[in-house]
């Protein structure tokens, strides 16, 4: 009887050690997929300034709400822009709650698209440009001829405090 208890104890010990080794290998395994920082949060608004700094660019940005559907219709009616139960034109309504400028860093290699007559017609004239060219546009220069001015608004994609992509919004 005693030898049976010893055998069971040894088997239990081996099972526990095997489970611990398996768990250590499984949960600490490196997938080998090192990915870049995500470029996620999308924010709509207007660029107030875009200045070059030592490591890239600094942007002062005025966020706004770009709403559509029921959200846009109700907000516009509450603001007296449309009659209650009437739809907003083009199914969107921009809400400017204030003009608090937020500061974002802009990666000098960020993807930027603006709207031009030479751009991709399937994407409303979307044309890639550099951050440097965007800074020139914000300063009133014309490195490219825009289809409509930047005050139509832009969408920025942000990772924490850094803009990694920026796209001009089309306004019909």
Label for each model-derived stretch:
Residues 1-13:
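N-terminal export and membrane-targeting signals
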